Design a protein with these regions (language model features):
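Conserved beta-strand positions
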Residues: 43, 77, 128, 159, ...
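Conserved, mostly hydrophobic/aromatic
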Residues: 41, 75, 157, 162, ...
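N-terminal catalytic cores of secreted or lumenal carbohydrate-active enzymes
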Residues: 19-203, 207, 215-223
Length: 476
């Protein structure tokens, strides 16, 4: 594919207020460092073998992200069904379960060595979620031994998924009320037992795995880890986050930059708790709306949310984000199934923006629908700027905003790639492009001629226009 350098795109639209963003010449002192592979994928436990063996786009789209990031994106294998799964050493297949409909997730399942062989075939970092809810620690230790022997690129093991949802009727609770304190005691006890089963292995657990910000938090669990001398088992703390659900789905609110800023801010104290122990904080499972609620998850707008959410999260110290891919054929927020889906464009653009980055800083105040991020290389020089107009556009007259950038180090021109679509509500790929290109459904590779916009710079100053529900990645 050849690169086409085009004039700055001039769009007939309704123009709104103008903004000015100044690009700092260096990143802020004490800013969070960016992980080389911040964009990851979480795959529902029972469905993982089919993602690898029956969906060619899994490897293709992971390879597309690798091409941009320079390393394979990390994957996490887990979810609700990890706490329904037991290891069976005699099982010849990867998994065994029955469901009434292919759209359903199983209520119970078993997995064998073949499952972990498939996980071990992935050359990037892998996190594996194992069962704690059923209170069979010996079975989990047996599974962990197979994980250790088969998964060469193992990052961590999770012991249970979203334990804040455990109930007193679950085996792990022994008929008692399940509280954050009970869970913390259970987590450290299981960490000790599994470590002993793995010859006193250290730094192997991704702890927490919560979906709650009240009492089931990294702060509270970290305190218990310190109290019991268990921090040596922990490699990272993680949380899960879905900002919306079927009962409150609203695409305009989902993509709103100010709402995204507020949502990520709720995790700042948990990031700090992990950092105080020199450990990473991970968003171990996340996506736009639980169970793809309300029809918003398959849209281009969800891709815009992914883009801004990744930028905001990495800036705030969340090292990696794992976007969940659920039941094949019944997954509204999935990035691919038999074809590439609209949200993948947001993930890809975030990977473009953060590739090789060491730090980022926010140029806006975080209280409006207009966002700006400056991205810095390893030497502390600004190399890219991401601008985002989160005004919601579905139909009718499309508004735009003028943004003036100052402090640009280039003397004459810079180039840019525009992420755009016919509307925030677009599903599939119709009308979506990044730099004028779209992803091939069979290859997950960009197709068509690249359209790089050229932006004039005068005395370190440039002006760009961005329509509602668009983003612009500028290369300095």
């Amino acid at each position: 594919m050849r690169s086409l350098i085009a004039p700055l795109l001039l769009i007939s639209a309704k123009w709104t207020n103008a903004l000015t963003f100044e690009i700092p010449s260096s990143p802020p002192a004490g800013g969070n460092k960016i992980d080389p592979t911040p964009v990851g994928v979480s795959i529902e436990f029972f469905a993982f073998p089919d993602y690898i063996e029956k969906l060619p786009l899994t490897n293709a789209c992971l390879a597309t992200l690798e091409d941009v990031l320079g390393a394979k994106p990390p994957i996490r294998i887990g979810g609700t069904t990890q706490d329904r799964a037991l290891y069976d050493a005699s099982l010849q297949s990867a998994v065994d379960y029955t469901v009434d409909s292919p759209d359903d997730a199983p209520d119970s399942l078993t997995f064998g060595d073949r499952f972990m062989e498939l996980a071990g075939s992935y050359e990037g970092e892998v996190t594996i979620g194992l069962n704690r809810r059923l209170d069979d620690v010996e079975n989990t230790i047996a599974a962990a031994k197979v994980v250790q022997s088969k998964v060469g690129n193992l990052y961590a093991i999770e012991l249970g998924n979203e334990p804040n949802f455990f109930k007193s009727s679950d085996p792990i609770a022994h008929g008692e009320a399940w509280t954050a304190a009970a869970d913390a005691a259970s987590q450290v006890s299981w960490q000790t037992s599994v470590s002993e089963g793995l010859d006193n292995k250290q730094s192997f657990v991704q702890a927490g795995v919560f979906f709650d910000t009240e009492s089931f938090t990294a702060e509270n669990l970290a305190a218990k880890e310190e109290e019991t001398g268990s921090t040596g088992y922990v490699r990272s703390f993680c949380h899960h986050f879905y900002p919306q659900s079927s009962s409150n789905a609203n695409l305009s609110r989902l993509i709103d930059h100010a709402d995204i800023v507020d949502g990520v801010a709720t995790f700042e104290s948990q990031v700090a708790a992990a950092q105080q122990l020199n450990l990473d904080f991970i968003m171990g499972e996340t996506n736009s709306a639980t169970q793809g609620g309300g029809g918003i998850s398959p849209t281009y707008g969800a891709g815009l949310w992914i883009l801004d959410y990744i930028m905001q999260s990495t800036m705030k110290g969340i090292q990696q984000l794992f976007f969940h891919q659920g039941t094949i054929g019944n997954c509204q927020y999935c990035w691919w199934q038999d074809s590439v889906n609209a949200p993948f464009y947001g993930a890809y653009t975030a990977a473009l923006a953060l590739s090789g980055a060491s730090q980022i800083t926010q140029l806006d105040a975080g209280d409006s629908r207009y966002a700006g991020y400056a991205i810095y290389d390893g030497d502390g020089h600004p190399t890219r700027v991401l601008l985002y107009n989160s005004d919601y556009y579905a139909s009718g007259t499309r508004s735009s905003i003028n943004i003036t950038l100052t402090g640009i180090p280039s003397s004459s021109t810079v180039s840019a790639k525009r992420l755009t679509a016919d509307a925030a509500t677009v599903v599939g790929q119709e009308g979506i492009s990044i730099g004028g290109q779209a992803f091939g459904d069979g290859s997950c590779e960009l197709e068509g001629e690249e359209d790089r916009e050229t932006i004039a710079v005068e005395n370190g100053r440039a002006e760009v226009g961005i329509r509602a529900s668009e983003a612009l990645l500028i290369y300095l």
